[in-house]
Amino acid sequence: IDEETGLLTDAEIRFGFQSKISFGEFKEGEIPTYLNALFCRFLLSSAEIYRTLEDWEQAEHCLALAGRVAAALRDRNFDPACSLFCRWSLESERMPDHNLFANFCAMYGGVLPLSSFEHFFYSFFNYDPPYDRSDESRHPYFHFLFMEMMFALGQREWPFRYFRDYWSKRMCSESMAWRADFNRDDPAPTKFSEGSGVSPNIFLLRE
């Protein structure tokens, strides 16, 4: 953690993270939007737990730190030219990359205000098929987090249509299992260890 800003830097390099979505993206000293936005989400959730336990001091500490991290991240990684977050700091020598995952994490983590939701949505999705405007949204890990956020925001009609379209494209008619890749045509294996056969149904029942 950078002591001055409170932002996380170099975590992938120092700890050897192997995220299927983000591994290898960042150079030394760069500020990952996704990681710091999820850090904000962690702090906000921690504040809720402390409030439940009536530990008001710790709750306020978590909220204050989340606000500090969010403000520092907006100052360094938010691009006012397109009203989207860059994957890394705008001060980086690399070209800006306003990808879906970085901006989703910013919305999910409370770094982007709710008033930005419509701009975020139409930057990466369509209201009618084809729904996806980015290949990143095809990743199952992203999909469940995205659905969780949409339901939490009170969205129902579009997410159900999107959910049905997404998983119908993954269904293998031979094995009745979910495909890991849209573009594969060989029989999909059923991996009970990963919950691949039931996870979409459990998610729908829960919501």
Predicted regions and their residues:
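Active-site core of glycosidic bond-cleaving carbohydrate-active enzymes
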Residues: 1-56, 60-207
